UniProtKB/Swiss-Prot annotation:
Its EC number is 2.7.4.6. Its main location: cytoplasm. Pfam families: NDK (PF00334). The active site is at 117 (pros-phosphohistidine intermediate). It comes from Rhodopseudomonas palustris (strain BisB18). This is Nucleoside diphosphate kinase. Major role in the synthesis of nucleoside triphosphates other than ATP. The ATP gamma phosphate is transferred to the NDP beta phosphate via a ping-pong mechanism, using a phosphorylated active-site intermediate. InterPro entries: NDK-like_dom, NDK-like_dom_sf, Nucleoside_diP_kinase, Nucleoside_diP_kinase_AS. Homotetramer. It catalyses: a 2'-deoxyribonucleoside 5'-diphosphate + ATP = a 2'-deoxyribonucleoside 5'-triphosphate + ADP; a ribonucleoside 5'-diphosphate + ATP = a ribonucleoside 5'-triphosphate + ADP.
Length: 140
C-alpha cells in the first residue's frame, strides 16, 4: 500500500473530556503518524463549509452547532493506506456498533457525539487538509 495522508478531527465531546492524548495513542498504535495537529475553535463559517455536503440534511444545523460548541483538534495523519486505516481505528459511526478497541467504542457518547471525524477517501482528505492547514504546517 502507498503512504498517504488523511484528515482527522477530534470533536468537542472528546476535547471537553480531555481525550486528545488517549485518542492520539490509539492513532499511533495503529501505525499512523500525526504529522500536523492544532487545537482550534471552529468558526460557524468553517463548520458550514466543512459539512456543506450535509446542508440539505435535517441534522445540518445541529451538526454545525455541535462543531462550534467547543474546541476541536484538527490533524493530518500519515501512513500506509492512512484513509482506510484511520476509518478502521475510528470504528462505526454508531458507537454501539463499533468494534472493541476502536476510538468510538472506547470514547463516543452517541451517534452525534462520536468523538472523531476522518476523511472517507484520499481525494476528500486532500480537500479537508487544505481547509485547515498550509503546506508548511505539515511536517512529515
Amino acid at each position: 500500500m502507498a503512504i498517504e495522508r488523511t484528515f482527522s478531527i477530534l470533536k468537542p465531546d472528546a476535547t471537553k473530556r480531555n481525550l486528545t492524548g488517549a485518542i492520539n495513542a490509539l492513532i499511533e498504535q495503529a501505525g499512523l503518524r500525526i504529522v500536523a495537529q492544532k487545537r482550534i475553535r471552529m468558526t460557524r463559517d468553517q463548520a458550514e463549509t466543512f459539512y456543506a455536503v450535509h446542508k440539505a440534511r435535517p441534522f445540518f444545523g445541529e451538526l454545525v452547532d455541535f462543531m462550534v460548541s467547543g474546541p476541536v483538534v484538527v490533524q493530518v495523519l500519515e501512513g500506509e493506506g492512512a484513509v482506510l486505516k484511520y476509518r478502521d481505528v475510528m470504528g462505526a459511526t454508531d458507537p454501539s456498533k463499533a468494534a472493541d478497541g476502536t476510538i468510538r467504542k472506547a470514547h463516543a457518547q452517541s451517534i452525534g457525539e462520536n468523538s472523531v471525524h476522518g476523511s472517507d477517501a484520499p481525494e476528500t482528505a486532500a480537500i479537508e487538509i487544505a481547509q485547515f492547514f498550509s503546506g508548511n504546517e505539515i511536517v512529515g
